[in-house]
């Protein structure tokens, strides 16, 4: 081996070896335990960012470790290649989305290979390829035949000038991103999959996932939102109409003072027929697209319809209001309002001077002030006829029973979860495989017509989808009669909901999945990705697995046994304010820093000498220009250094602060490992380790080696605390660099230690370890080496080193048996030559013994 550590020379050579020998190719082998490790695949945006690097490094460390344990490891890779950004980039760069996407894939693949990830590239998937989405289209038609797919009208963002649908990201402050025309809300027919049919299974399945983060499971439980309540039907006075509401608080039923309905509710349209003011308000409310998350904080607005509902128990007439906080797609599109016991209803009632009637009192009889806020806790009923004095449970059941007997109510389990709308009025997606016949009937495209191929050689004008703009694309036939293809494309969450399963058989042509391969590899043993996917991708991922199970493709209940959600990568962000008062963000790589003695930034300047404002550590982003290019870092420091820093700087689930000083520290550490192996190699051990001939110092060093092996094995395997595993190896390295190499047994102990260090670091820094493994005299590549095992016997301490002090000053060290009592320790210590000269001819006043550690002798003349 050469004397200097040169990652620029080592890494390309090792990567070439891996590629040529297909080291990471996974083949089904029933004789071996499988291990499927998967990191969420990326959108091919053009360049890797540090978030990608962190995600894939974690997955690669786990994969390499599991391979060393003797498991048959699958670690595939692919591209979530459809999506809106490609359309924007195509318009900007005057190219086709497909061309832009494929160029990005090629570039990012090279970047990934520079980092040395052990992917099985023979299983690579790009979701924009027809051979992938063909089976997605086929599966959709099968779900349609099973009654799990339907079409209904739904609200979209509509630009009246361009006559096109806009994604939420294309609406800027209520206007079209392209022409600045005010955006309207429009109802159009869209396709839905009945995820609500699986709500109970999705909820119950969370209890079978002990190795998923609790936060993710809680977020999914809340998103599914199971509630038990009562659906109540009110008659509308002086009409034949009825209005239904759903409530989880029937105990408050006697306190209802008005009903709120959504702007899109049929009753609202009825009331607006002869009321132009109400019609205008309804239109305004419809156009003001409201996210559920904003309901609590938005200004509550409403208008009376002039209609009244009849309270089924009291006979009271309750005014019906159109309210902007009631959403048509949530529940029944109508709510019973109890201002005394719901804060939102309270704010609305106060604004419009509606009655506030108390029907719940605190259990402890304390005073409440219903002029300031609603009392929302459970309590005992008041002003509620025969139910006065009952608690929540008693009132819930009593009032529900009464409503059911009267035929105006029924107990019901509801879910917050809505069916999955999969239609997108975009071009760059998989075409939805449905056909419209001349008579208006809609039928699924037959298998022989699949895939319905998305044309890739198109021109984007930024207005209409090319398949919508082309009058001929949609034309087709069905049973020899003219038909039209659907011009909507799938939500890209469709592709990412089943890719993990297709990786098990990416070249399989006879069906969606090869059940034999799928059931060998699935479920995924370790899935890795950001927690931001908790309620979208990770829910659809679980849903699709249950659909695949019910279609007979898989036998497992859940798609992944274990989930790790890695933290974000942060970097310093700097800016200056321009003459037009705009913040100009400067890349941290262009900033010169001054720090105080504690390392805090006290001054930052850009290359022009401008003083910059340091806005702190924030998530790497284009908007703040604080992204660090992984490729630049690999070229500067080497892939192993970048990987080591990524795994060491923070626990995997926590945010990671990018500090170049930390990267430099990682490079220095690898240099020390290299130097120690080089130093050992100059005079290596010529005989094997003789455990019977070890000195006390050699036993202590060997004990440290095996204690480190035990800790690192537990940290990487069970605990997945990779940073503490690395810290343990660093601590061991400090001891090894101070160890003697003088005797043959010294060198034999060192040989064992270095073999262990190289194997422990291999999952994290594989290139340098590949080279060092060979330098240590191993003939086969480290990629086939077994994980190092701790020797239990070596960790047993049969002797202790006791520090001996005389009058508080260290005068010697003695070795005693671990179970030696105080008298034995004193006898050995007093006989030690170094100690004797300080206690001979002295009067021993007292002896203090700290068991197993220290003996202090207090003397005087």
Curated annotation (Swiss-Prot):
Gene: leuS
Positions of short motif 'KMSKS' region: 619-623
Principal cellular location given in the protein's record: cytoplasm
Molecular function terms from GO: aminoacyl-tRNA deacylase activity; ATP binding; leucine-tRNA ligase activity
Catalyzed reaction equations: tRNA(Leu) + L-leucine + ATP = L-leucyl-tRNA(Leu) + AMP + diphosphate
EC numbers on record: 6.1.1.4
Similarity annotation: Belongs to the class-I aminoacyl-tRNA synthetase family.
Signal sequence region: none
Pfam family, one: Anticodon_1
Transmembrane segments: none
GO cellular component, one term: cytosol
Residues holding ATP: 622
InterPro entries according to UniProt: aa-tRNA-synth_I_CS, aa-tRNA-synth_Ia, Leu-tRNA-ligase, Leu_tRNA-synth_edit, M/V/L/I-tRNA-synth_anticd-bd, Methionyl/Leucyl_tRNA_Synth, Rossmann-like_a/b/a_fold, tRNAsynth_Ia_anticodon-bd
GO BP: any one term: leucyl-tRNA aminoacylation
HAMAP family: Leu_tRNA_synth_B (MF_00049_B)
Localisation: Cytoplasm
Record's protein name: Leucine--tRNA ligase
Keyword terms: Aminoacyl-tRNA synthetase, ATP-binding, Cytoplasm, Ligase, Nucleotide-binding, Protein biosynthesis
């Amino acid at each position: 081996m050469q004397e200097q550590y040169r990652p620029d020379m080592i890494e390309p050579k090792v990567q070439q070896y891996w590629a040529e020998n297909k080291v990471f190719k996974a083949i089904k082998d029933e004789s071996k335990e499988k291990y499927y490790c998967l990191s969420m695949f990326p959108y091919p945006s053009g360049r890797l960012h540090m978030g990608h690097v962190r995600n894939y490094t974690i997955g690669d460390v786990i994969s390499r470790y599991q391979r060393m344990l003797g498991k048959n490891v699958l670690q595939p890779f692919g591209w979530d290649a459809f999506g809106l950004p490609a359309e924007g980039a195509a318009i900007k760069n005057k190219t086709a989305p497909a061309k832009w996407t494929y160029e990005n894939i090629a570039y990012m693949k090279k970047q990934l290979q520079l980092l040395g990830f052990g992917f099985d590239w023979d299983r690579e998937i790009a979701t924009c390829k027809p051979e992938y989405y063909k089976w997605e289209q086929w599966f959709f038609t099968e779900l349609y035949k099973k009654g799990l797919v339907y079409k209904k009208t739904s609200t979209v963002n509509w630009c009246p000038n361009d006559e096109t649908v806009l994604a939420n990201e294309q609406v800027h402050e209520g206007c079209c991103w392209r022409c600045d025309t005010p955006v309207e809300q429009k109802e159009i027919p869209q396709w839905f999959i009945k995820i609500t049919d699986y709500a109970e299974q999705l909820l119950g399945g969370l209890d079978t996932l002990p190795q998923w983060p609790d936060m993710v499971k809680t977020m999914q439980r809340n998103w599914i939102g199971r509630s038990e309540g009562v659906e109540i039907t009110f008659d509308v006075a002086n009409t034949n109409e009825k209005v239904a509401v759903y409530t989880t608080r029937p105990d408050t039923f006697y306190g209802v003072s008005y009903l709120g309905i959504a702007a899109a509710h049929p009753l609202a349209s009825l009331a607006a027929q002869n009321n132009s003011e109400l019609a205008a308000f309804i239109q305004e409310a419809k156009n003001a697209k409201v996210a559920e998350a904003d309901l609590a904080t938005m200004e509550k607005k409403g208008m009376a319809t002039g209609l009244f509902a009849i309270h089924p128990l009291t006979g009271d007439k309750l005014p019906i209001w159109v309210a902007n906080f009631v959403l048509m797609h949530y529940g029944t599109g109508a709510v019973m309002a109890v201002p005394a016991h719901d804060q939102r209803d309270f704010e609305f009632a106060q604004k419009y001077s509606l009655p506030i009637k108390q029907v719940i009192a605190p259990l402890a009889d304390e005073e409440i002030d219903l002029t300031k806020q609603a009392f929302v806790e459970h309590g005992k009923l008041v002003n509620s006829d025969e139910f006065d004095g009952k608690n929540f449970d008693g009132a819930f059941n009593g009032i529900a029973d009464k409503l059911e007997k009267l035929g105006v109510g029924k107990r019901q389990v509801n879910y917050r979860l809505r069916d999955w709308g999969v239609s997108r009025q975009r071009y760059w997606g998989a075409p939805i495989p449905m056909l419209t016949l001349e008579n208006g009937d809609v039928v699924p495209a037959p298998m022989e017509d699949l895939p319905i191929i998305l044309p890739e050689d198109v021109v984007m004008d930024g207005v209409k989808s090319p398949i919508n703009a082309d009058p001929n694309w949609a034309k087709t036939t069905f049973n020899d009669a003219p038909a039209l293809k659907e011009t909507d494309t799938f939500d890209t969450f469709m592709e990412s909901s089943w890719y993990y399963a297709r990786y098990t058989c990416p070249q399989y042509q006879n069906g969606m999945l090869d059940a034999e391969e799928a059931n060998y590899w699935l479920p995924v043993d370790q899935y890795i990705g950001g927690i931001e996917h908790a309620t979208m991708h990770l829910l659809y991922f679980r849903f699709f697995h249950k659909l695949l199970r019910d279609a007979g493709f898989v036998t497992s209940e859940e798609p992944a046994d274990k989930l790790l959600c890695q933290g974000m990568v942060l970097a310093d962000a700097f800016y200056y304010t321009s003459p037009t008062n705009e913040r100009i963000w400067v890349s941290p790589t262009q900033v010169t820093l001054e720090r105080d003695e504690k390392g805090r930034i006290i001054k930052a300047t850009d290359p022009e000498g401008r003083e910059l404002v340091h806005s702190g550590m924030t998530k790497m982003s284009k908007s703040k220009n604080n992204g660090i290019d992984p490729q630049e870092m690999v070229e500067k420091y080497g892939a192993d250094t970048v990987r080591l820093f990524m795994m060491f700087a923070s626990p995997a689930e926590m945010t990671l602060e990018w500090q170049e000083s930390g990267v430099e520290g990682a490079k220095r550490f690898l240099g020390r490992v290299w130097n120690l192996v080089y130093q050992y190699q100059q005079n290596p051990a010529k005989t094997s380790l003789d455990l019977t001939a070890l000195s006390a110092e050699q036993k202590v060093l060997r004990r440290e080696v095996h204690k480190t092996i035990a800790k690192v094995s537990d940290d990487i395997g069970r605990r997945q605390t990779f940073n503490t595993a690395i810290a343990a190896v660093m601590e061991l390295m400090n001891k090894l660099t101070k160890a003697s190499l003088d005797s043959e047994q010294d060198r034999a102990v060192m040989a064992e230690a270095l073999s262990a260090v190289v194997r422990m670091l291999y999952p994290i820094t594989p290139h340098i370890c590949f080279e060092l493994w060979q330098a240590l005299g191993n003939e086969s590549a480290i990629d086939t080496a077994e994980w190092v095992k701790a020797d239990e016997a070596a960790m047993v301490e049969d002797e202790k080193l006791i520090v001996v002090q005389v009058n508080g000053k260290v005068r010697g060290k003695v070795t005693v048996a671990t179970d030696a009592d105080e008298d034995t320790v004193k006898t050995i210590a007093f006989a030690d030559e170094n100690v004797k000269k300080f206690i001979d001819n002295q009067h021993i006043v007292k002896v203090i013994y700290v068991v197993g550690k220290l003996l202090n002798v207090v003397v005087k003349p």
